[in-house]
Each structure stands twice: as structure tokens, then as C-alpha cells.
Amino acid sequence: MPELSDAAQRDVVLVVDDAPETLSLLTDALEAGGMTVLVATDGATALQRVSRIIPDVILLDAVMPGMDGFETCAALRAQPPLAQVPIIFMTGLADTEHVVRGFDSGGVDYVTKPIDPDVLIARLRTHLANARRMFSARAALDAAGRALLSATPDGRVQWSTPKAQTFMAAATDTDRGPDKL
């Protein structure tokens, strides 16, 4: 089996921040940490970037002109390919209200500025490892060929295997009800 090039093995990080000095600091630190960095200076640009490439992790400033980080996070989470990509807020907003809002909008972590690049890279690596484990577990369940799903307490399906999706589609088909499965 051919070995992947160094570039192919690098984690891809999308950094979304409107401050050039923060973008420069983070780009230098993340690239030195062996990661590939994509940059966006606002929420709309971030949404354009992810339409072309799905990053492994997203670093997102909360305070930006136009669409703020909280709105951007919610818009990113609404896209199925990004549902499991870790989004980490990095901002000067340290009030409990803002931290809670960051998590409520879909963030998995919240780092306050000034940012310590070494601590940030350690956090990124932890979130990346967790995301990989989750992806592997889901892939294994999908490959098992069984009808499995995860639902919220109110009954909304959060995740399902392809076999479960087939059954759910058949159950909601107007020509074939659940009694026809």
C-alpha cells in the first residue's frame, strides 16, 4: 500500500477570525504543529470555504462583522457533512452567557483570548482524536448492516445506519405504511 504524503496526512483546520494578527499567529502556530490551515475572515467566507473542502476542525471567533461566530456555528452545524466536525470558539468574550451561547450554538470547546498556541494545539489534537474515534465507530455500525439509530428523548432521530434509513423511508412512504415492512 503506498504511503500518504506528509501533506495528505496533515489535519486541516479552518480558522475564522476578522483580526489579521490573530490569523497570522494561529496560522504560524498551527502550521508549525503540522496542520494545514484554511482562513476565513467572516462567517460568509467560512461557509464558502466549507462548501469546497470539509476541514477536520474549525476555530471560530465569536465577534465578527456581519454574521457573528454564534450564527456562523449554527449555520455550519446545519450542514450534514459538518455535523461531527469539532468547532472550537476562540474569543475575548469570557462571560458565562457567551460561553453557554457558544456551546448552545454547536461548539465543542471555548477558548478565551489571549490564546496560548501550545494549549490550543493540545486541545485541537484531543478534539481531533475524539472525532476520529466517533467517525470510526459510526463507520463500523454502518458496515454492520443492521438497523440502528440514536434518538433524542423527544423522539428526533440524531443518527441512523443506512439500513435504519431504508426502514424509516419505507415506513413514511404513503404507498407503504409501517405494516408493509
Question: What positions do the PLM features span?
Answer:
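Charged docking surfaces used in two-component/phosphorelay signaling
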Residues: 24-32
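Acidic catalytic/metal-coordinating carboxylates
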Residues: 21, 41-45, 63, 68-72
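Active-site beta3 strand of CheY-like receiver
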Residues: 53-59
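C-terminal output helix
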Residues: 114-124
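Short, glycine/charged-rich "phosphate-handling" switch motifs in NTP-dependent
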Residues: 108
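PAS-family sensory domains
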Residues: 145, 149-181
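The feature encodes the CheY-like receiver
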Residues: 23, 65, 83, 95, ...
